[in-house]
């Protein structure tokens, strides 16, 4: 469990550093649905941009620099969706000011960099923003696994892709942490760690890099979790948009059709299959209530700040996640299995 904190009376007040798309289009709208905390401020490198989004989203305070928001004594928690190379520096800066930080994934560019966040003051919570672990479909799927309905778990298979060849997009900038492994491979890795409830021992990967961007545009890996448990995944930034998670055991299989970008407009479904038919005839559809995973994520983080409920996944978990990504990149160079 992640270390917790005890906040004084009054709602937790959030600040958002950056007007990145994921924040203003997904995370902040989800947060604004909640009455469990306040979204007090938003910051951008340019004040007019911050003011524009503050007005559009109904956020009271706008800042023209990240440092101004971090220094605001009225802010208790910060959400950091900055480009990947700024995750650790700005998260650490905020933590040293006593702010709790929910940082977008990946939490850093390497495990060594992520470990710098261990310098956060005692009682300050730092966590990686894997919103999927708060969605009812993931929680239900894991509950099915833990109850043994799939038998002995053997494999987790993940596909996740989209098409983006825009040279101005941060996902295509190698020097600041662009590429498939950082952007969406992290979801595949967390899928294996979540459902196996274990840490992998070794990785072998195959990576194809864009000849112009030098980012990994297709990354595939086989991840060994020991005891006959395998995670296999392919992720890509220049493929048709698609996502799927399959969890397979000796007695059954779970399929999550929209595992990562679950829509908020309607109920979600996962499929439980006993494998008696090669098609889907034997599959049972399990309907889950509609939910905003970003809202649920922020509420869980807020409860941890308030001392009401410890986070299940904190900084230690984020560092373990980065160790797997490190091994994926080492295997690309060695063309061999790499220990995690």
Predicted regions and their residues:
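Short, conserved SAM-binding/catalytic segment
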Residues: 52-59, 117-122
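N-terminal Rossmann-like dinucleotide-binding module
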Residues: 1-57, 302
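Beta-strand-loop-alpha-helix segment that lines the small-molecule cofactor/substrate pocket
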Residues: 77, 83-133, 148
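NAD(P)-dinucleotide binding in Rossmann-like oxidoreductases
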Residues: 209-216, 226-297, 314
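Hydrophobic residues in well-ordered beta-strands that form the structural core
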Residues: 23, 63, 80, 102-103, ...
């Amino acid at each position: 469990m992640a270390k917790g904190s005890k906040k004084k009376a009054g709602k937790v007040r959030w600040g958002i550093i950056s007007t990145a798309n994921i924040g203003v289009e997904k995370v902040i709208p989800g947060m604004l649905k909640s009455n469990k905390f306040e979204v007090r401020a938003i910051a951008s490198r340019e004040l007019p941009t911050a003011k524009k989004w503050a007005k559009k989203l109904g956020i009271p305070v706008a800042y023209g620099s990240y440092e101004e928001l971090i220094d605001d004594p009225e802010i208790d928690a910060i959400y950091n969706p900055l480009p990947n190379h700024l995750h650790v520096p700005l998260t650490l800066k905020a933590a040293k000011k006593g702010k709790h930080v929910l940082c977008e994934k990946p939490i850093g560019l390497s495990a060594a960099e992520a470990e710098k966040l261990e310098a956060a003051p005692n009682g300050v919570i730092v966590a990686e923003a894997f919103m999927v672990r708060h969605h009812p479909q993931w929680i239900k799927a894991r509950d099915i696994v833990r109850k043994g309905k799939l038998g002995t778990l053997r494999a987790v298979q993940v596909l996740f892709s989209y098409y983006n060849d825009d040279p101005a997009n941060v996902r295509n900038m190698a020097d600041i942490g662009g590429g498939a492994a950082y952007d969406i491979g992290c979801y595949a890795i967390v899928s294996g760690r979540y459902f196996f409830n274990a840490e992998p021992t070794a990785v072998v990967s195959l990576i194809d890099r864009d000849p112009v961007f030098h980012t990994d545009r297709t990354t595939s890996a086989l991840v060994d979790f020991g005891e006959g448990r395998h995670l296999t995944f392919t992720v890509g930034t220049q493929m048709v948009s698609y996502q799927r998670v399959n969890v397979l055991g000796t007695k059954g299989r779970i399929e999550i059709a929209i595992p990562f970008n679950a829509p908020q407009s309607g109920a979600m479904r996962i499929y439980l299959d006993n494998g008696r038919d090669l098609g889907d005839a034997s599959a049972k559809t399990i309907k889950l209530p509609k939910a905003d995973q970003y809202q649920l994520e922020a509420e869980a983080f807020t409860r941890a700040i308030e001392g009401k409920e410890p986070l299940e996944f904190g900084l230690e978990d984020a560092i373990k996640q980065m160790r797997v990504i490190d091994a994926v990149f080492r295997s690309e160079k060695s063309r061999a299995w790499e220990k995690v």
